[in-house]
Regions:
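Conserved phosphate/anionic-ligand binding catalytic regions in large, soluble enzymes, centered on
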Residues: 41-45
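Phosphate/Mg2+-binding loops and adjacent switch elements
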Residues: 1-2
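ATP-dependent carboxylate-amine ligase
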Residues: 23-39, 51-206
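Acidic-glycine-rich active-site phosphate/pyrophosphate-binding loop
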Residues: 5-31
């Protein structure tokens, strides 16, 4: 900024875009995908979007309108942190299947209120063993219940191999107290929904 370059950064409860003495401010409460700034990776996405739109010389009215009107619902962004209410519980659907994504999702979930946290997860068989294990290593620090399911397509893995790796990642888990293996994605989701109570949170990894 001191050199007169454009910068985008977060300050307090707003995202700031500045160049020299020219400054624009957008409150996080005006950017729905950030859920008031509690979802850090969505704050980063919003900052990147602001920077890209500014570089294209879009007007700030257009940028603000775009940020205010974009929601990460199933119609706008399917499988990207879609949040639903279900009988007083919170459901989140996301297509995160690598350790970095799982870490970001876990951090986001920890910022949301919940009496009990549950996650439904499988893993792609064409990932490295350590990447599959690491996903549940991360989840085991933040979720009370972990429901493991075997996907219909194992991508070259033997029957039960992916489930075994996911279970290995939960050895020594600091928070998880309930682990269940289920065959079939939809059966696993139905099982999770049946266990949910008002005030719970369930992350479903599609």
């Amino acid at each position: 900024r001191a050199r007169g370059n454009r910068v985008v950064y977060m300050s307090g409860d707003a995202i700031i875009a500045a160049q020299g003495k020219e400054t624009y401010s957008i409150l996080l409460t005006d950017i729905p995908i950030t859920r008031g700034g509690t979802i850090s990776f969505q704050v980063e996405n919003a900052m990147a979007s602001i920077g890209a739109a500014w570089a294209l010389n879009l007007s700030w009215d257009v940028i603000r309108t775009g940020l205010r009107s974009f929601n990460n619902d199933p119609d706008s962004a399917p499988g990207r942190f879609n949040v639903f209410d279900y009988r007083g519980a919170t459901l989140i659907a996301d297509y995160g299947h690598n350790p970095d994504a799982i870490a970001a999702l876990t951090k986001a979930v920890q910022a949301m209120p919940a009496k009990r946290r549950m996650v439904v997860i499988s893993a792609a068989g064409d990932r490295r063993d350590e990447d599959i294990r690491q996903q549940t290593e991360i989840l085991g620090t933040a979720f009370d219940d972990v429901l493991l399911y075997q996907d219909a397509c194992q991508r070259g893995r033997a029957d039960g191999e992916v489930l075994g790796l996911l279970r290995q990642g939960l050895v020594g888990a600091t928070r998880t107290s309930h682990v269940e293996e289920i065959h079939g994605e939809f059966v696993a989701i139905d099982t999770a929904l049946a266990r949910l109570q008002a005030g719970d949170l369930c992350l479903i990894l599609l």
